[in-house]
């Protein structure tokens, strides 16, 4: 009989935090994008604020910390950054709505969203080494940020406000993230690849 001390220790199986972060990001993005696209009235924003604090913010921060522990630099940077984005958004809407801060000029919001678009574009370039599903999320997201920024600058494309177009791109982004989260949970639960998320565009 083998000595138990001599038996190799097996590392406990650790869950993938990615689906949690994607779900928090995707669900919150869909709800806010319904407002940006005009599918919900502006009065619906107070519904988004606690959702952004809790699921959009905290869930992604948890995912970011777990990605850090797993040694995934890309996942850590992405989830932590967008989790803090939702905290920034929620805190801004909360303080302005409570009258603690004055409403910022549209140009300030535009520049902020534009910088988030630039940041997301850079992460999109990095995501060429990830699977095609994650790559598509970042593609749609930087387009969303740019359209929202142009909307705050007051630009239009024909009869369409750029902010409204950004809302529809945001809907696609959020739904894409939710789908990827679902697929990752499904594959993990089945312990096999039920649905493929696509191979990386750049594999070298």
Predicted regions and their residues:
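Mid-membrane cores of alpha-helical transmembrane segments in multi-pass membrane proteins
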Residues: 21-31, 50-62, 75-92, 107-120, ...
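A structural feature that tracks compact, well-ordered secondary-structure segments
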Residues: 33, 37, 63-69, 75-78, ...
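Short, highly charged, low-complexity non-transmembrane loops/tails of multi-pass membrane proteins
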Residues: 190-204
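Membrane-helix interface "capping/anchor" motifs
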Residues: 66-74, 125-136
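Transmembrane alpha-helix boundary signature
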Residues: 92-100
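N-terminal topogenic module of multi-pass integral membrane proteins
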Residues: 1-63, 67, 202
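Alpha-helical membrane segments in multi-pass integral membrane proteins
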Residues: 109-122, 132-155, 159-183
């Amino acid at each position: 009989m083998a000595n138990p001390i001599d038996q190799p220790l097996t590392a406990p199986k650790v869950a993938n935090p990615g689906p949690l972060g994607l779900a928090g990001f995707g669900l919150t993005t869909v709800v806010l994008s319904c407002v940006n696209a005009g599918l919900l009235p502006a009065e619906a924003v107070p519904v988004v604020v606690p959702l952004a604090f809790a699921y959009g913010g905290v869930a992604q921060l948890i995912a970011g910390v777990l990605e850090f522990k797993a040694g995934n630099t890309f996942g850590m940077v992405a989830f932590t950054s967008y989790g803090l984005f939702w905290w920034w958004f929620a805190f801004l809407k909360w303080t302005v709505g409570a009258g603690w801060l004055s409403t910022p000029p549209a140009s300030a919001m535009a520049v902020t969203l534009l910088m988030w678009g630039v940041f997301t574009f850079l992460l999109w370039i990095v995501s060429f080494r990830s699977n095609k599903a994650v790559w598509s999320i970042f593609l749609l997201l930087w387009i969303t940020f740019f359209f929202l920024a142009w909307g705050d600058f007051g630009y239009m494309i024909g009869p369409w406000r750029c902010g409204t177009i950004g809302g529809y791109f945001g809907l696609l982004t959020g739904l894409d993230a939710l789908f990827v989260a679902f697929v990752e949970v499904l594959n993990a639960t089945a312990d096999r690849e039920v649905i493929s998320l696509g191979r990386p565009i750049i594999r070298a």
